[in-house]
């Protein structure tokens, strides 16, 4: 395929067209591109492979170089491996103070994970729109992130206005503010519920209670069916011969309700086939 160089020579070609009269007026960009030409040629040129002109392979230079004593290096030495695994050559791990504070807070308060959270975010930096001079926000619920951002604000404010606080002191101050607000929130919720009950409010069952009720309905039906099948199984064992009655009773005592129900279903299938 021919090398595409038209984009890089647009100024020269336009000048030629203006000179020969193909273009009557200069384009609006002509003077700007002439005053500030591009510094980098982005044309992709094919790599010409000629004998003894190609750069040596770094693998060959590392593992295949000949020494003065006539030996050839075929594997990396301990020093080479040490330099290869050096921390300078590794990609640095990103560490943020916010992540460390979150780890500490949720390690101390694991039940905060059980509170419902909004997982839908537009940009992920909604906390920047909040005023962290106070912890309670209008458009954000009280959670561990409030403690983290409040701690960072206290640290920044103490450096400007003083007295200077350490990280531990700022975290403790934000944590106790969180405790007071959380206790006030739970107290208001409890008082509001008691007042509603006093005025005759009837609260519906929770999702957990509703699930237990539905499960109990199926358990009651199963208990009735299991009781009936147990009676049928005991009656069938009573009709056995007297010689094998002792062994059958011992075997029936060992079988469970589930096994007896399976035996009854198998017997019914045999009767239907006959």
UniProtKB/Swiss-Prot annotation:
GO cellular component, one term: mitochondrial small ribosomal subunit
Main localization, broad class: mitochondrion
Family: Belongs to the mitochondrion-specific ribosomal protein mS23 family.
Keyword Mitochondrion part of the UniProt annotation: yes
Quaternary state and interactors: Component of the mitochondrial small ribosomal subunit.
Organism: Scheffersomyces stipitis (strain ATCC 58785 / CBS 6054 / NBRC 10063 / NRRL Y-11545)
Disulfide bridge map: none
Gene symbol of the encoding locus: RSM25
Pfam family, one: MRP-S25
Molecular function GO terms recorded: structural constituent of ribosome
InterPro entries: Ribosomal_mS23_fun (IPR016939)
Keywords per UniProt: Mitochondrion, Ribonucleoprotein, Ribosomal protein
Region entry Disordered, spans: 233-259
Superkingdom field: Eukaryota
Protein location: Mitochondrion
Protein's UniProt name: Small ribosomal subunit protein mS23
């Amino acid at each position: 395929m021919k090398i595409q160089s038209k984009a890089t020579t647009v100024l020269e070609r336009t000048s030629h067209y203006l000179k020969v009269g193909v273009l009557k007026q200069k384009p609006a960009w002509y003077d700007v591109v002439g005053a500030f030409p591009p510094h980098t040629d982005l044309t992709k040129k094919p790599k010409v492979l000629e004998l003894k002109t190609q750069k040596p392979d770094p693998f060959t230079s590392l593992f295949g170089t000949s020494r003065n004593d006539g030996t050839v290096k075929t594997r990396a030495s301990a020093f080479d491996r040490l330099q290869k695994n050096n921390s300078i050559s590794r990609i640095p791990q990103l560490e943020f103070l916010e992540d460390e504070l979150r780890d500490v807070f949720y390690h101390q308060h694991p039940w905060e994970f059980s509170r419902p959270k909004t997982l839908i975010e537009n940009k992920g930096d909604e906390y920047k729109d909040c005023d962290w001079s106070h912890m309670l926000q209008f458009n954000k619920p009280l959670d561990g992130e409030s403690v983290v951002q409040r701690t960072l604000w206290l640290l920044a404010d103490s450096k400007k206005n003083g007295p200077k606080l350490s990280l531990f002191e700022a975290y403790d101050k934000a944590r106790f503010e969180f405790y007071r607000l959380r206790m006030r929130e739970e107290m208001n919720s409890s008082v509001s519920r008691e007042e509603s009950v006093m005025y005759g409010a009837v609260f519906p069952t929770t999702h957990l209670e509703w699930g237990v009720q539905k499960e109990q309905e199926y358990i009651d039906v199963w208990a009735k069916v299991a009781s009936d099948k147990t009676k049928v199984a005991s009656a069938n064992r009573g009709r056995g011969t007297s010689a094998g009655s002792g062994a059958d009773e011992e075997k029936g005592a060992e079988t469970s309700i589930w096994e007896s129900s399976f035996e009854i279903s198998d017997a019914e299938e045999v009767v239907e086939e006959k």
